[in-house]
Design a protein with these regions (language model features):
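Hydrophobic, aromatic-rich transmembrane alpha-helices
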Residues: 181-184, 192-217, 221
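Signature aromatic-anchored transmembrane alpha helix within multi-pass, membrane-resident enzymes
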Residues: 43, 130-134, 258-280
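Transmembrane-helix motifs of polytopic, lipid-linked glycan transferases
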Residues: 18-38, 78
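Hydrophobic/aromatic-rich transmembrane helices and adjacent perimembrane loops
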Residues: 107, 214-262
Length: 280
């Protein structure tokens, strides 16, 4: 709906592709403010912006069709920024922004809230956002299943036991047969995907540090590695936008943790790596 006025003025598929790229690019604005919160100087912020623009996940996903996931980077980054600023209204508006994108966008908001609860001890605001996200998610799924065309839970059939065709079925599989789930997540095709997603960030999201960073990997595991739906683990499509946004934030957190390594050097290496993968 936000893009409809532009489409009315310039109807056509080309304008939709351009608008999608612009929407994704807007994510750099809250990203810069997040970088400033982590004590980055302007030169470092420029490098961080370059990483964002050339990050293959963001750039490659712009070239195929149009998808509501394009709003995830800017929405998630705004929510993270609002939490870091401890802005009540910012958190409220950003949470609404994220939840309004699609039903499963609530999962990203939930993981951000969980991370803020444990890493920044923002118990009250974090728990409220978490509960709102969970209630919204199950409410939206119920509505779609009963009054719409149903959710796309069939894309998770490989991790949902027969007769348990819902989100709870995924949780059951993880608890009952974790070895099977592990095999689904780290097969050869998924390992190639992990390299493409992580290498431009120098694998910083999984660099040893504070354990809370593991929380930010949740959507990657859930949406991109667990399902066998091939497009979920293909950066040429938009299904990695949300997960990659959290990975990028995790990389920023890791850079701040690595006090002995100059931020400029790490960001420069990330920029070069992103450009190389972008060109490959």
């Amino acid at each position: 709906w936000l893009l409809l006025p532009f489409y009315l003025i310039y109807p056509g598929t080309a304008i939709l592709q351009v608008l999608q790229a612009i929407v994704i690019a807007l994510g750099v604005i809250p990203l810069i403010f997040i970088g400033k919160n982590h004590h980055m100087k302007w030169g470092q912020l420029i490098l961080l912006s370059a990483v964002y623009f050339f990050y293959p996940v963001m750039s490659a996903g712009c070239s195929y069709d149009i998808h509501e996931n394009m709003f995830l980077p800017v929405a998630i980054l705004c929510l993270i920024l609002a939490f870091e600023k401890d802005s009540l209204w910012g958190i409220v508006v950003s949470t609404i922004f994220v939840l309004s994108i699609k039903e499963d966008a609530a999962i990203y908001a939930a993981f951000v809230a969980i991370y803020m609860i444990f890493s920044r001890k923002m118990y009250k605001k974090g728990i409220i956002v978490l509960m709102v996200s969970i209630i919204y998610f199950f409410g939206a799924v119920y509505y779609i299943n009963h009054f719409g065309m149903g959710t796309s839970s069939d894309r998770f059939n490989n991790v949902i036991a027969s007769g348990d065709g819902n989100v709870l079925g995924i949780i059951k599989t993880v608890l009952v047969n974790p070895a099977y789930v592990f095999g689904q997540m780290f097969c050869e095709e998924k390992l190639n995907y992990i390299i493409v997603v992580m290498a431009p960030l120098l694998f910083l999201p999984i660099w040893p540090g504070k354990w809370q960073k593991v929380i930010l990997l949740g959507p990657l595991f859930l949406f991109n590695l667990m399902p066998d739906y091939e497009y979920f683990s293909n950066i040429g499509f938009q299904y990695t936008f949300g997960s990659a946004t959290l990975l990028l934030y995790s990389a920023i957190v890791s850079i701040q943790e690595l006090n002995k390594s100059p931020k400029t050097k790490l960001l420069a290496m990330m920029t070069v790596s992103s450009i190389l993968f972008f060109m490959s």
